Amino acid sequence: MTTQYGILFKQEQAHDDAIWSVAWGKNKKNGSETVISGSLDDLVKVWKWNDEKLDLQWTLEGHQLGVVSVDISHTGSIAASSSLDAHIRLWDLETGKQIKSIDAGPVDAWSLAFSPDSQFLATGSHVGKVNIFGVETGKKEYSLDTRGKFILSIAYSPDGKYLASGAIDGIINIFDIATGKLLHTLEGHAMPIRSLTFSPDSQLLVTASDDGYIKIYDVQHANLAGTLSGHGSWVLNVAFCPDDTHFVSSSSDKSVKVWDAGTRTCVHTFFDHQDQVWGVKYNGSGSKIVSVGDDQEIHIYDCPV
């Protein structure tokens, strides 16, 4: 029995406002799977994925304004959230308690990402800097300076070597983390870069932009390997599949699309949301996709592996 693409589960009214961010994590100790959602209702919600459904485990309160970005550490034990209140909060996923609140300073920290070793948390800023905080210390350890505009999106490469940032003017920068040097500046888009994602082997970088296009870059040589069109509006999020072959995108055209990175073609489109889809992620095995959007719903889809 091969799995077909299809919607598996729908959590309606998951939040009282638009859901702008989602993450899917797996606890390395006990194997349990967790989905976390961040919403403009100021809340972070922690859901257990069990028996093919989501069960609300915790509602995490603390942010004073909307939550715009969430991530789960690679150990699966800590969640991070950033908000329009300029604070980053770290949460213990086993107790639902806040571990620490980090004042990001007078910056708009729109996007955050755990480093692959879960030791650091990177966040973009409106002054073109990527600030790196220590997860243990909660202090800013160092910054990477793009000398550019407002950074809307960031991503670590899974091998821990690179950090990519996407700015509001469509510029993408790739840093060498070990040296802090700016390796490549990519100018493929003319509009804001909402999201970027590395392939599991860290060889490719996929970018999503308000120009409606998705671009695939060869990281090492900074070559444009492909331009994909298909969404009818802004592309808001992209995430690579653990199978190293597929990636998923979401858009303000209300759709979620699965792409084959090798053939550069769309293999499936989900039209299940009623409004723009802000966040999309794969689970650890690549067999499921989660999406969230302005319709306040969380959707889980089945994917053939």
Curated annotation (Swiss-Prot):
BP terms from Gene Ontology: negative regulation of myeloid cell differentiation; nuclear-transcribed mRNA catabolic process, 3'-5' exonucleolytic nonsense-mediated decay; rescue of stalled ribosome; transcription elongation by RNA polymerase II
Gene Ontology CC terms:
Cdc73/Paf1 complex; cytoplasm; euchromatin; nucleus; Ski complex
The segments carrying the WD repeats are 14-57, 62-101, 104-143, 146-187, 188-227, 230-269, 272-305
Subcellular localization is given as: Nucleus; Cytoplasm
**Keywords attached to this entry:** Cytoplasm, Nucleus, Repeat, WD repeat
Matching Gene3D superfamilies = YVTN repeat-like/Quinoprotein amine dehydrogenase
Residue ranges spanning the membrane: these are none
- Ribosomal protein in keyword set: no
> Could you name the domain of life of the organism this protein comes from?
Eukaryota
On assembly, the entry states: Component of the PAF1 complex. Component of the SKI complex.
For this protein, the record's PANTHER family field holds: SUPERKILLER COMPLEX PROTEIN 8, WD REPEAT-CONTAINING PROTEIN 61
Its function? Answer: Component of the PAF1 complex (PAF1C) which has multiple functions during transcription by RNA polymerase II and is implicated in regulation of development and maintenance of embryonic stem cell pluripotency. PAF1C associates with RNA polymerase II through interaction with POLR2A CTD non-phosphorylated and 'Ser-2'- and 'Ser-5'-phosphorylated forms and is involved in transcriptional elongation, acting both independently and synergistically with TCEA1 and in cooperation with the DSIF complex and HTATSF1.
Tell me which family the UniProt entry assigns to this protein. Answer: Belongs to the SKI8 family.
What is the protein's given name? Superkiller complex protein 8
Identify the species of origin.
Gallus gallus
Ranked from the top, the taxonomy reads: Eukaryota, Metazoa, Chordata, Craniata, Vertebrata
